[in-house]
């Protein structure tokens, strides 16, 4: 990739507040000049005028936050302010937004259009900075905008054509120069308990006055207001049950994984705004355990990425197509040098927080499901990685994860995840919410006994066989590890309500060699995206080919999978095979017609599922764990992750994506012994193994 060489050393963020204020004052002066008189060619005047106007609006918001006047505003005034921040990218206006790469490409040509769309999107990251008092986040983006404006102004004055390479070069060095800043405000924020913006907002606000939501700078939809109102009216004992299940799951995860919780000093809470009563109880629970709580909100940007599910406390998504369009903006700049620089940024920022990272216990995550279905619209104008960049991106993800684990100690890191519905799930929202609370609170001990019956059967097999029915083409042979001491060893983990709430699965890391066949699901939602007739071919444990039927063009279908399941790795190992046992959740989903909207945490418990990528024990394979019956879990690795000591760069992929087959598409699951005899666990979507009869009661009652 061609970029202009830069002779000076990287611009490091100034140490003094005075320097930052000086840069900011100069930048605002430049933005005012850009707004007052346009010196670019006519073609670009409206673009830069709109960017300047947005920046000046950001200054007004930052001022209202700084002087406290925002807290004197009425609820309707705050709604209007919030709307003006995000209206440009909502579906009603996105078609003619300068953040839309299709629109800008049509106006300015593809190369410049993509770059200017990136710039408009990056400028929007100042919203979060304005509300958090992050002057650096504002000044670096103002300076970038002014630098690009200067290129266009000079070209107009000299009556010469704009050269995209100069625009790209300025943007490239912006991404490179501020790699540390980007890491600090994305990856490292999970361990940084010194950032108290979100913590204080949640713990100190009057939650009966929902104006507090608008002090975040996040997009506050009617759905988030509805959520906050619903949580506010719940009985205290129900909120306590929700939060206690969450925090106890985190604590029990350490016991289940045989990890030393006494070395942990902090936990990172993530989720959507609107659940503040829940968060308050969870924070208090964690603090009673002796943990500090890190909570942050980070804007989508070239540094944090444009993920549909963000790793922080976040607001509503004003337009998922916007995030989809910008998810590979880095393709505009990515080369080997930038990969190295970004890795340097991660390490440098973690060095600043080495002590906090060393005592970090992991994330406690609240996920939302039930939002309106999103079917992305693909276009050739959207930035996309080329083949070489796909390799670089995959390599970066793996190395970045490794860099994080040089500071975060895996031997005392755990997690927990719980999910609740969004009001968008439909008119039965409250009934569905109550049902999910019940499902999340199901008795672990009862399921542990039932699941042990399944494990005892599976442990007799040398492989498992899974077949679909009624048009589902699944036909998989999954090889299992040899149990050299069956009396004291097991292949499958007995998973109840600890790290993955709710209860209901047994899982293993398959032996890759000999694992072959086809995985097929008629319709499945994965990380917010729908896949129709998803099909993955598995050879020697590796996903080697794939397709779906979302688009008329199969090349576009394959790209959807490559981008969001394969993550540009070309091939991925089957990192997990599991059998979900939560038939109550399955029946509830059918009752309310929300199967397609279930979060993967619940969906994976409603049938067998397979994950491609790393195993469930990624970077923790050498930590011995045991099931409740005292048997050691030996299936913690495979032939790929076995390379972790000899060739660590080849051992991990930095991804793990679950794909579930619903019971009604399931013909059979059988364990096959060495002599060829079979133990049937599920037949025609029903549990038939002795000891599992209880699981069918939910089916029979429906």
Residue ranges and their predicted role:
Residues 2-513, 683-702:
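Active-site bordering "gate/hinge" segments
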Residues 459, 527-530, 570, 603:
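Short solvent-exposed loop/turn micro-motifs enriched in small/polar/acidic residues
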Residues 466-472, 523-526, 671-675:
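Short acidic, glycine-rich loop/turn motifs
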Residues 497-535:
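Conserved AWS/pre-SET-to-SET junction and N-terminal core of the SET lysine methyltransferase domain
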Residues 531-548:
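Active-site and channel-lining beta-strand-loop segments
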Residues 545-621:
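Dual-mode signal for accessory low-complexity, basic/Gly-rich regions
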Residues 606, 612, 620-626, 636-646:
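Glycine-anchored, exposed beta-strand/edge motif detector
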Residues 629-702:
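Extended hydrophobic packing segments that form well-structured cores
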């Amino acid at each position: 990739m061609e970029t202009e060489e830069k002779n000076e050393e990287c611009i490091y963020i100034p140490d003094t507040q005075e320097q930052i204020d000086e840069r900011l004052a100069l930048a605002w002066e430049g933005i005012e000049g850009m707004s007052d008189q346009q010196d670019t060619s006519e073609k670009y005047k409206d673009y830069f005028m709109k960017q300047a106007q947005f920046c000046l609006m950001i200054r007004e918001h930052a001022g209202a936050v700084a002087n406290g006047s925002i807290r004197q505003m009425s609820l309707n005034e705050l709604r209007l302010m919030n709307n003006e921040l995000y209206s440009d990218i909502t579906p009603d206006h996105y078609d003619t937004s300068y953040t839309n790469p299709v629109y800008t490409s049509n106006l300015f040509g593809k190369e410049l259009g993509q770059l200017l769309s990136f710039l408009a999107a990056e400028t929007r990251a100042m919203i979060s900075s304005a509300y958090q008092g992050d002057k650096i986040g504002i000044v670096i983006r103002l300076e970038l905008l002014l630098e690009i404006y200067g290129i266009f102004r000079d070209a107009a004055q000299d009556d010469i054509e704009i050269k995209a390479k100069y625009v790209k070069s300025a943007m490239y060095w912006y991404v490179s120069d501020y790699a540390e800043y980007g890491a600090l405000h994305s990856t490292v924020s999970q361990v940084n308990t010194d950032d108290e913006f979100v913590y204080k907002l949640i713990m100190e606000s009057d939650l009966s006055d929902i104006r507090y939501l608008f002090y975040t700078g996040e997009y506050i939809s009617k759905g988030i207001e509805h959520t906050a109102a619903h949580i506010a009216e719940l009985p205290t004992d129900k909120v306590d049950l929700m939060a206690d299940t969450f925090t106890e799951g985190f604590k029990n995860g350490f016991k289940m994984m045989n990890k030393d919780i006494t070395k942990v000093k902090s936990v990172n809470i993530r989720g959507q705004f609107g659940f503040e009563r829940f968060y308050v109880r969870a924070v208090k629970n964690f603090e009673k355990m002796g943990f500090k709580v890190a909570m942050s909100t980070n804007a989508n940007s070239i540094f944090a990425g444009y993920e549909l599910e963000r790793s922080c406390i976040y607001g509503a998504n004003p337009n998922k197509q916007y995030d989809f369009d910008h998810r590979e903006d880095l393709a505009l700049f990515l080369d080997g040098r930038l990969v190295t620089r970004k890795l340097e940024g991660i390490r440098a920022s973690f060095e600043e927080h080495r002590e906090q990272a060393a005592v970090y216990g992991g994330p406690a995550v609240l996920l939302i499901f039930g939002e309106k279905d999103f079917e992305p619209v693909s276009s050739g104008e959207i930035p996309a990685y080329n083949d070489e960049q796909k390799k670089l991106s995959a390599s970066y993800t793996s190395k970045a994860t490794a860099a994080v684990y040089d500071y975060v100690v895996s031997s005392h890191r755990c997690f927990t995840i719980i999910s609740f519905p969004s009001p968008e799930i439909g008119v039965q929202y409250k009934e569905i919410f109550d049902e999910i609370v019940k499902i999340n609170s199901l008795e672990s001990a009862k399921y542990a006994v039932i699941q042990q019956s399944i494990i005892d059967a599976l442990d007799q097999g040398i492989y498992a066989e899974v077949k679909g029915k009624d048009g589902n083409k699944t036909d998989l042979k999954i090889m299992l590890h040899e149990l050299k001491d069956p009396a004291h060893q097991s292949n499958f983990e007995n998973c109840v309500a600890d790290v993955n709430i709710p209860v209901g699965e047994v899982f293993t890391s398959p032996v890759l060699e000999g694992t072959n066949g086809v995985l097929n699901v008629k319709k499945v939602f994965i990380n917010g995206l729908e896949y129709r007739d998803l099909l993955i071919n598995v050879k020697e444990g590796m996903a080697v080919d794939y397709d779906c039927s979302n688009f008329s063009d199969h090349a576009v279908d394959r790209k959807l999978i490559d981008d969001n399941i394969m993550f540009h790795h070309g091939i991925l190992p089957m990192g997990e095979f599991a059998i979900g046992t939560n038939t109550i959740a399955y029946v509830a989903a059918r009752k309310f017609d929300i199967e397609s909207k279930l979060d993967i945490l619940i969906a994976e418990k409603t049938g067998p599922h397979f994950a491609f990528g790393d195993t469930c024990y990624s970077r923790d394979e050498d930590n011995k764990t045991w099931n409740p019956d005292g048997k050691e879990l030996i299936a913690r690795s495979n032939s790929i992750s076995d390379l972790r000591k000899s060739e660590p760069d080849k051992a991990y992929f930095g991804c793990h994506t679950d794909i579930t087959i619903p019971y009604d598409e399931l013909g059979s699951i059988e364990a096959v012994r060495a002599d060829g005899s079979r133990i049937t666990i599920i037949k025609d979507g029903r549990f038939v193994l002795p000891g599992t009869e209880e699981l069918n009661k939910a089916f029979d009652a429906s």
